[in-house]
């Protein structure tokens, strides 16, 4: 596959010990330019940390983690197709294509600690299903359903509201993912970015045509270290995964919102660094 990377300085972190964050891009095999953020450099024996955002969110939602992790780890945050600064194509909004995008992004890398939040966790599992675990050191799933019981509630009404008034529904959605809402300017920026993707493409990401057992089987069979970080909405799924896959590490954030790594960054970052240290 032909790939090229073009970088420009995005920003310089104000903390002296933090690395610069660079925005780069690469071209997929179907011709799409996907953007990502990169911070830090490779450290001997340390895994490369790759961060996957959730539904319609940009990679920069991990900005605190990029700054923190890059002190010791090469850290990357991908903008999936149609999200963040990546190209918005007319097609490719399927689990298979987006897992392929991730595969192509990781081709030049190894010893990866892959962290997927929400939809990013589902797509990380699809990557494992399609391409295996040879490049992975471990996997972290952040507040994502894994197909265990109980099932999440129906999203039918949300989809109807989204079609009827996308901007209003997105504003409500973005506010709801935080227990401690950020300033309105930041919410507006996240909403504005989320509207880049066409309505039906956005909703297609919520309707991957797989039985819940598909995800359950992937995660139960995952043979490398696995950390499942959840809020109370997935507490029962986490307990059942622990029962069915005892090696799974589980951490519950009782007071955080869905974007728990934004609400409680110090606790989340310490948890990930402790987990990553055991992989070195």
Question: What do these predicted ranges mean?
Answer:
Residues 19-33:
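N-terminal cap/lid segment of alpha/beta-hydrolase-fold proteins
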Residues 125-166:
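Flexible "cap/lid" loop of the alpha/beta hydrolase fold
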Residues 256-269:
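Catalytic histidine-centered segment of alpha/beta-hydrolase-like enzymes
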Residues 32-87:
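Conserved HGGG/HGGXW glycine-rich cap/lid loop of the alpha/beta-hydrolase fold
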Residues 29, 37, 67, 77-115, ...:
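Active-site loop/oxyanion-hole signature of alpha/beta-hydrolase fold enzymes
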Residues 53-55, 116-121:
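Conserved alpha/beta-hydrolase "nucleophile elbow" surrounding the catalytic nucleophile
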Residues 199-252:
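Conserved serine/cysteine hydrolase catalytic core
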Residues 149-153, 164-221:
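Conserved alpha/beta-hydrolase catalytic His-Asp/Glu region
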